[in-house]
């Protein structure tokens, strides 16, 4: 039965607020400071977080950062990884690579030192946890519903985070891909209300619309219509950001154009133009655009763009040496040989082998 009295629901909510205030219940931090701020401290009960971006722009990387941080800091969280895009083989290799700094081919094909083997075992042991469940292949909305309902029933007192990577990989059982995506989101909207502390992180792609306008700096900021497939995701999410790495799209000199006084908290990343305009320096930077914030601390001063510096230019790349020219200075007027009149010059061709007689 879906109907419940206001008294019953209010009493439950007041009890939950009391647990947060007393410290009995702790919010789930994502480990990403600007994201925790956007969430007003972290993942609270019923939150739906959307992460959108083009392929290879770091959506899965962010989700892996969040998962790693949650498992390291919150033992009472059950994390469900619906890894519909990357197999567990790839996920584990990526984790090892990120935490050791070694490339995947080096991990796979080079003999490890004793020190490296110790680190490798430590990382693998971190992944041998009972607190993570993997849905290691795409499923239909119906199977997703059944699996999550089962977890909810078996874990009424645990905090649960469900992460989907990514929405477009839903297994289509009937109708179109969009219909299946919508069906899954309808289930998320229902499931978030049937457990006292469950949150959802949903990854999705950007569509091709962005590529059609990215050459114009005035139109380079992502908008909600850039989200692939379904506007239901935008409607459902409490917080949604688009992650973009402009230099991967060939945008190297400047990114966006805006009044120089905008984005005052990002002054270190600006490139100032003529007059009152400025742009962002895109080199080695990842941009986070918060397209939706259902709740904010200060409506007047919303900070909805953040930048992470991935790497910086080498010194040799920052300045380009212009060719130099030196004008000779003479202390006395230079003396040139007497000019020969071309009219009186008669070259001899009697012997081309004699350099004295050569006309060249």
Language model features: what each stretch is:
Residues 74-156:
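Cytosolic-facing regulatory segments adjacent to core modules
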Residues 82-84, 202-207:
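Conserved H-loop
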Residues 49-51, 78-80, 135, 201, ...:
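Hydrophobic/aromatic beta-strand patches that form the interior of the parallel beta-sheet core
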Residues 163, 198-205:
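Structural recognition of the conserved hydrophobic beta-strand(s) that form the central parallel beta-sheet
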